[in-house]
Design a protein with these regions (language model features):
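Structural alpha/beta surface segment adjacent to cysteine/selenocysteine redox centers
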Residues: 24-129
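Glycine/alanine-rich phosphate-binding loops at beta-alpha junctions
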Residues: 2
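C-terminal cap of thioredoxin/glutaredoxin-like
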Residues: 5, 9-12, 16-19, 24-38, ...
Length: 210
C-alpha cells in the first residue's frame, strides 16, 4: 500500500543528509508565508542503503566514488546555503553516523503518538546532529531525544529492535526508489518534484505553480 498522497507535500529525506536539514529550513519558511500551506508528509530515504548489510549494519569499505574533492565541494555548498538560509549548523560530525535506528524510532513515534510529538522528535533529531554534533546512531542519544518529547526510553529500545518497523522502513525506502527518487532531499507534490535544498520561492512554484 502506497504511503504517498498527491495532496500532500511529500519530503524524501534522511537525518544524515545536510541538504535535507537545509531544505527543511527553506520549506518551513515557505510554509509560514503561504496563504494555504499544504500538509507535509515525511518519507524515509536510506542515504546509506547501498552500503547496508542485510542485518542493518554499514559496510564502510564500499567504494562510492566520493573523494576528498567531492566532500570539499559539499562542505562549500553547505556553508553557502546555511548562511543564505540563516541556519545554525555545525559540520563537525562523523561521516560514519548512521540514522537507521533513528528513522525506526521516528516511524514508531509517528504511528504511536500525535503529530505534534512526531514533529518535535523529528526536529530535535535533526538538530541533535546538525546543530549539536551528536551521534544520532547511538541508541542512548536517540532515547534522550525521545524522552525530551515524552516518549519513554523502554519504547525507544523496543522500537529499535522491532522487526516489523524494520520491514516497514525497508518497504518505504523501496517505494521511494520505485518512484524514481535517487537523491535527497526530494520534494514531491501533485505529480511534480524538486530535488535539493531549494529556496522558499521554488516551493511556491512547486506547490502553487507560480
Amino acid at each position: 500500500m502506497s504511503t504517498i498522497s498527491e495532496d500532500e507535500l511529500t519530503v524524501f529525506s534522511d537525518y544524515v543528509c545536510p541538504f535535507c536539514y537545509l531544505g527543511k529550513a527553506a520549506m518551513e519558511e515557505y510554509l509560514e508565508e503561504a496563504e494555504d500551506p499544504p500538509e507535509v508528509e515525511w518519507h524515509v530515504f536510506d542515504l546509506r542503503g547501498y552500503k547496508r548489510h542485510p542485518d542493518g549494519s554499514i559496510d564502510h569499505d564500499v567504494e562510492d566514488g566520493k573523494d576528498d574533492d567531492y566532500f570539499a565541494q559539499v562542505r562549500d555548498n553547505v556553508e553557502r546555503l546555511k548562511d543564505e538560509y540563516d541556519v545554525e549548523m555545525t559540520l563537525d560530525y562523523s561521516l560514519e553516523v548512521d540514522s537507521w535506528d533513528a528513522q525506526k524510532v521516528s516511524l514508531y513515534v509517528k504511528q504511536a503518538y500525535d503529530e505534534e510529538t512526531f514533529e518535535e522528535f523529528h526536529e530535535r533529531t535533526f538538530k541533535a546532529l546538525w546543530r549539536d554534533g551528536r551521534d544520532i546512531g547511538d541508541p542512548d542519544v536517540i532515547a534522550d531525544i525521545a524522552e525530551s518529547v515524552g516518549v519513554p526510553e523502554e519504547e525507544v529500545r523496543d522500537a529499535i529492535d522491532d522487526d516489523g518497523l524494520e520491514a516497514e522502513l525497508k518497504r518505504r525506502f523501496e517505494e521511494a526508489q520505485e518512484m524514481g527518487v535517487s537523491g535527497i532531499p526530494t520534494f514531491a507534490y501533485d505529480g511534480h518534484a524538486a530535488r535539493g535544498a531549494i529556496p522558499p520561492h521554488q516551493f511556491e512554484r512547486l506547490v502553487e505553480g507560480t
